[in-house]
Amino acid sequence: MGINLKVSRPKAGSNINMSNTFHTIGLIGKPNHKGTTLTLKRLHHWLSMQGYKVLVEERVAGELGPQVQSVDLLEIGEQCDLAIVVGGDGNMLGAARVLARFSVGVIGVNRGNLGFLTDLPPDSFEEALSKVLEGEFEIEQRFLLEAEVHRHGELKSSNTAVNEAVLHPGKIAYMIEFEVYIDDKFMYSQRADGIIISTPTGSTAYSLSAGGAILTPNLSAVILVPMFPHTLSCRPIVVDAASIIKLVVSPHNSDNLEVSCDGHVHLSVLPGDEIIIKRSQETLRLVHPKGHNYFHVLRTKLGWGSKLF
C-alpha cells in the first residue's frame, strides 16, 4: 500500500531538505523533570556554542536560566527549522499535535521508557545530532487523525491524534453500545469497553496492548481495535486511511462517554452522539539519523530475537 501525504504549507525559515542547513532550533521538554532539565541545559549550551539560534519552550525555559529565549510552542513551529523534544513518547505526542501544523522537523531525545519516537540517547546525543545538523538525516512523514464529536448534526468539539483516538466510558470501565460505519457503510454494532482507532504510529502503543497488529509507518492505513468486546467473533480490522470512520453512540448508554486523543485530550460524548474519525491534513515530519531502521527499533524496544546467522 502506498502513502500519499499532504504536507502543511511551509512557513518561512522552516522548509527542510537535504541541501539546507539548520539555523534556528527549538527545545521542548517535560517540565520539572530532573533528567530532562539536565539534557536541555546540555543541548542549549552545546547548540549555542556552535552558533545556532536556540529557542526554548516557555514551560521549561525558567529551569534553564534567565539567559534563554523563551517562546511558546506555536512560535517554535513558526520560527524553527528543527524542534528537539526531550522526554518520552508522551512528551513527543503532546508537542507533535501542535508542531504538525507547521513544516518544522521534529527529533526526540529519549528520557522516557520505550521511546519509539525518540531516537537520540540522552547521555550521548552529540555524535548523532552532529550528523543530523550536517545534513545526514532522513525525514519520515507520519499522518495524524482528526476526531470530531457531532450532536444533533452540529459539530461540538474536535482535536487531532498522532497515535490513536479512543471511544471509552471514562474513568470507570463498563460496557457501552455503539455502531461502526466505514464510508457510511454499516460494519457492525458493538458492545464493548470501547474501541481504539489507531494510526501506524500508534500501532505500537495502546492498540498493540489491546491485541492490534503493528502497522509499518509507511502504510496509508488505520486499525480499529475493539476493547474487550462482548463477543468471540469480533477482531481488529485494518482499513484504508482515506476512509471516514463513524461511530454512532447508542442513546441507551446511561452515562457520558469520552473520546481521548493520544490519552491527552478528552472530548465529551453524550448518548446519541456521532463521532467522525478521519485522516487529518496535518503531517508530522519526524527527523531520523541517516540509516534509521524501523525494524531495528521494534527488535530493540519489544525484545524480538536477533539474527541467528
UniProtKB/Swiss-Prot annotation:
Involved in the regulation of the intracellular balance of NAD and NADP, and is a key enzyme in the biosynthesis of NADP. Catalyzes specifically the phosphorylation on 2'-hydroxyl of the adenosine moiety of NAD to yield NADP. Its EC number is 2.7.1.23. Keywords: ATP-binding, Cytoplasm, Kinase, NAD, NADP, Nucleotide-binding, Transferase. The keyword NADP applies. It is found in: Cytoplasm. Belongs to the NAD kinase family. This is NAD kinase. Gene3D superfamilies: Probable inorganic polyphosphate/atp-NAD kinase, domain 1, Probable inorganic polyphosphate/atp-NAD kinase, domain 2. Pfam families: NAD_kinase (PF01513), NAD_kinase_C (PF20143). The keyword Zinc does not apply. It comes from the Bacteria. Coiled coil: none annotated. It is an enzyme of class 2 (transferase). One of its GO terms (molecular function) is metal ion binding. Transmembrane segments: none annotated. One of its GO terms (cellular component) is cytoplasm. It comes from Shewanella halifaxensis (strain HAW-EB4). It catalyses: NAD(+) + ATP = ADP + NADP(+) + H(+). PANTHER family: NAD KINASE (PTHR20275:SF0). One of its GO terms (biological process) is NAD metabolic process. NAD(+) binds at residues 89-90, 163-164, 191, 193, 204-209. Its cofactor is a divalent metal cation. The active site is at 89 (proton acceptor). InterPro entries: ATP-NAD_kinase_N, ATP-NAD_kinase_PpnK-typ_C, NAD/diacylglycerol_kinase_sf, NADK.
